[in-house]
Amino acid sequence: MGIKKKRQSKRLTTRKREGMLKRARANERKKRRMDRKMQAKVERIPPSVLRTDEENMQYAEIKRMAKLRKMEYDEALRNSEKKEAYLDGILRLVSKSDVVIEVIDARDPDSSRNSEAEKIVSEHGKKLIMVLNYTQYVPREVVDEWKVHLKRDGNDCIEVTEEDMRQIGKETRIGIFGNPGSGKNFVLRGISRILEEKPNSVVVSVPLSKVTLSSILRGCHGLMGIAFRDYIEAIVKRIDRGEVSLRHGIPEFSNAEELLESICDVHGIRDESRSVCYMKASERFLEDFLRHKILFWRRVYSDENDLSFAFCQ
């Protein structure tokens, strides 16, 4: 009787089984990649084609406002980080000064003041003198109104004149603070000229508390990251639109959008984004305010956007 041959097992070895699973996974990945490539090649209708023009404009405005909100948040975050640094500078200024001068823009004194810095000066018992700068661009009666208003808290309020500056003695240590562009160094040079020598002084720049129409017209804030069209609209509502049309050589307009469109056409401002075009047109429009070709000022107790305007020849 012969020996019965043993049947070969159908079980796979571990090595073969793992190899088959590995090849299966690789084939599955390859299939998914091919499916994605084929899907990408399929022509799809963009969502913008399915929307009406009005819906597209609304969608673009939503995106623009979301971008502005993010930029405003980033700016607020940066300002909060800078706040402690400038307050430290004010503390050093107060400690080294006998008299503290706050340089204020006469065109809008309220928005150019810094209440936190003023409070530090008061708490340290130092004398605060408010100096109104740019008074030559404001009607005399408006300057006088502001001087009376600012003196109500017991502080001195003067102008950059020889008679007013004489009260600052040569031996006095002076601390000067104010917003960017307020004219701090101009005031210091005026004091040096009147006293016939440069006084012992410390100068600190303090940020504005918020964005206002006058701070934009004074060049303290750029247009990037703010709702600049709202401020242009506020100007259009209050200014002589006929005079603006003559100065820029543009047709008559009734609102900010028509003004900016006309400036874009006249100066050949073109860009893929309408918002960028309008920002460039706004910067061109604001040049006359920065160069003092269009004067502006705010009266006591007026709203922060309620400015008066006058045109220079």
From Swiss-Prot:
Residues 1-41 are annotated as: Disordered. GO terms for biological process: ribosome biogenesis. Required for normal processing of ribosomal pre-rRNA. Required for cell proliferation. Binds GTP. InterPro entries: P-loop_NTPase, TRAFAC_YlqF/YawG_RiboMat. It comes from Encephalitozoon cuniculi (strain GB-M1). The lineage of its organism: Eukaryota, Fungi, Fungi incertae sedis, Microsporidia, Unikaryonidae. GO terms for molecular function: GTP binding. Keywords: GTP-binding, Nucleotide-binding, Nucleus, Ribosome biogenesis. GTP binds at residues 95-98, 178-185, 212-215. This is Guanine nucleotide-binding protein-like 3-like protein. Residues 15-27 have a biased composition (Basic and acidic residues). Belongs to the MMR1/HSR1 GTP-binding protein family. The keyword Nucleus applies.
